């Protein structure tokens, strides 16, 4: 029976030796922590921030790492395939993943596989997406404000109402996007080579009003 006096939200759980398995730490911030000695077998680690954390001595058998955040400084156990675990970070294999409305702000997603990913409504503000292949991804209503998308491929993407304001789109491939009705490109860097092609898109796309940014796609490209 749940003891409400002893209960604490999963996101407030601190990694401490001696906790009984399986742990429920969904949404917790464990960034920069040394997790040696923590029993993580079968642990619920969804959305846990593991950036800079040391899990090299942990047993992650059966742990749920979906949407957990890692970076180049995160240390995983030898032989553990963190890139295919559902966690989000550089080199993650997320083709076709359901990431709708996910909070992905400020993450290093370089070398990620995001082909066909469902990212509608996801917040990617300030994230590093340089060279990422987003071919066929659903980015409708996604927020990419200030994101670095240098050399990213958006071919066959749905970009309706995507917010690219102040993003760096240098060498990005946008011409093959399926649709970009209402997308806002205000203040984007590196769009000069693509601007003419984007402005030749159907008028129904270019003249769609974005109620959030209060711009049409056309005016955002012409600014």
What do these predicted regions represent?
Residues 1-223:
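Tandem repeat scaffolds
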